[in-house]
């Protein structure tokens, strides 16, 4: 009878223990299993559940009948407890139900739209400590030079790397500062990134960054540098041409203050204009007119950067210098020819040529139509501005001289 009673008490303890474990497990309790499992012991569990070992201590149990019964129950409890895994032990130890669920950590998003560097929290502690401080970008880059390649060597897309994106936001902030305008080197920026990413990946990456207002200027200047760099020209050209960006729009967004032919960024823009011209203008008679229009537009963007005195022959000389750059021989020569024609327009105005007289002098109606018709039309525009009292209708005059093609030429010229 006594043995059956002991067995019943033992089973009751076991089922009570299992019920507590299952209840705790199903409640979704959140525990630090590793730390709790290392400190779990029977006495601590008993004290939390307001239980006690027989006689207060298993080592000092008295050898009485009641003590022997309690000791058997205690041993059965300990045997069942020790067979549980660590998770169930921890649940049984705490016996606490928590309804609090930790809020999910929001995913970091870098594009599109600008995000200040200090609002982004990378996982890397060294990077976080650098980015949240006020250290100059150059010193940050020196320290990140050890971090960047190691972290990004397995990242196929730079935009997926928190370190790269956060760092570039910091670089962009620095480049807009008074000190950064004079010291920012895109060659150095390229050298920092190129060990981790190929030119093709960098080109595609920076073309995409132009959609981010905070990084647009940095991206465009970086692309301009890579365009003029012989080893990366082809990769950047393909990526930029794929975007279909017209050079005139890039010129406006880059906000050039002066046409410095020694400036890598300005030369990079000219290089892209050359690639654009070769890519979008096929060899045909009608397309040749649009190509001439394209070169006049490039000239009109550059000319206002110089004073009147310098434009007299100065731009012609500078454009001829572009012919020494590989891949820009024809582009530079076409711009030099236009600069030469524009210089002659000033001479024709000083000589008081009438539009009719200049049309015959340039032999526009002969085989020189493509070369000279836009020069003549530009002269007519300046002539009517200088001599407003002399009415002249260039379209009517062209129809009389050239016939049907005159209307198409005038429509193309109207886009200039």
From Swiss-Prot:
It comes from the Eukaryota. A motif (RxLR-dEER) lies at residues 49-88. It is found in: Secreted; Host cytoplasm; Host nucleus. Keywords: Host cytoplasm, Host nucleus, Secreted, Signal, Virulence. Its main location: secreted. Induction: Expression is up-regulated at the earlier infection stages. Residues 1-20 form the signal peptide. GO terms for cellular component: extracellular region; host cell cytoplasm; host cell nucleus. Effector that partially suppresses the tobacco programmed cell death induced by cell death-inducing proteins. Belongs to the RxLR effector family. The RxLR-dEER motif acts to carry the protein into the host cell cytoplasm through binding to cell surface phosphatidylinositol-3-phosphate. This is Secreted RxLR effector protein 25. The gene is RxLR25.
């Amino acid at each position: 009878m006594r043995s059956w009673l002991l067995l019943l008490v033992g089973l009751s303890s076991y089922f009570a223990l299992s019920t507590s474990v299952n209840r705790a497990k199903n409640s979704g309790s959140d525990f630090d299993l590793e730390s709790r499992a290392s400190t779990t012991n029977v006495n601590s569990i008993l004290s939390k559940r307001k239980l006690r070992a027989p006689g207060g201590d298993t080592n000092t149990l008295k050898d009485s009948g009641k003590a022997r019964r309690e000791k058997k129950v205690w041993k059965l409890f300990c045997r069942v407890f020790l067979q549980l895994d660590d998770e169930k032990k921890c649940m049984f130890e705490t016996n606490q139900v928590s309804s609090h669920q930790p809020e999910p950590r929001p995913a970091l998003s870098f594009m599109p739209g600008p995000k200040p560097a200090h609002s982004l929290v990378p996982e890397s502690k060294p990077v976080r400590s650098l980015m949240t401080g006020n250290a100059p970008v150059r010193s940050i880059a020196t320290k990140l030079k050890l971090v960047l390649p190691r972290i990004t060597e397995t990242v196929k897309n730079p935009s997926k790397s928190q370190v790269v994106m956060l760092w570039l936001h910091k670089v962009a902030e620095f480049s807009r500062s008074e000190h950064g305008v004079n010291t920012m080197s895109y060659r150095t920026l390229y050298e920092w990134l190129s060990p981790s990413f190929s030119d093709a990946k960098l080109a595609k990456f920076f073309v995409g960054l132009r959609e981010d207002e905070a990084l647009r200027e940095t991206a465009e200047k970086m692309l301009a540098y890579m365009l003029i760099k012989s080893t990366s020209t082809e990769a950047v050209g393909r990526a930029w041409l794929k975007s279909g960006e017209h050079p005139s729009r890039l010129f406006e967004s880059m906000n050039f203050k002066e046409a410095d032919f020694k400036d890598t960024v300005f030369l990079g823009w000219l290089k892209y204009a050359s690639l654009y011209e070769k890519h979008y203008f096929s060899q045909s008679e009608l397309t040749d007119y649009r190509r001439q229009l394209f070169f006049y537009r490039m000239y009109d963007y550059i000319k206002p950067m110089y004073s009147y005195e310098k434009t007299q022959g100065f731009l012609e000389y500078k454009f001829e210098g572009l012919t020494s750059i590989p891949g820009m021989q024809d582009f530079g020569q076409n711009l030099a020819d236009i600069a030469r024609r524009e210089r002659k327009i000033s001479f024709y105005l000083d000589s008081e040529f009438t539009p009719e007289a200049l049309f015959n002098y340039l032999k526009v109606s002969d085989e020189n139509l493509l070369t000279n018709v836009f020069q003549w039309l530009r002269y007519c525009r300046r002539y009517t501005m200088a001599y407003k009292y002399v009415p002249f209708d260039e379209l009517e005059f062209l129809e009389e001289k050239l016939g049907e093609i005159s209307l198409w030429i005038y429509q193309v010229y109207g886009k200039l």
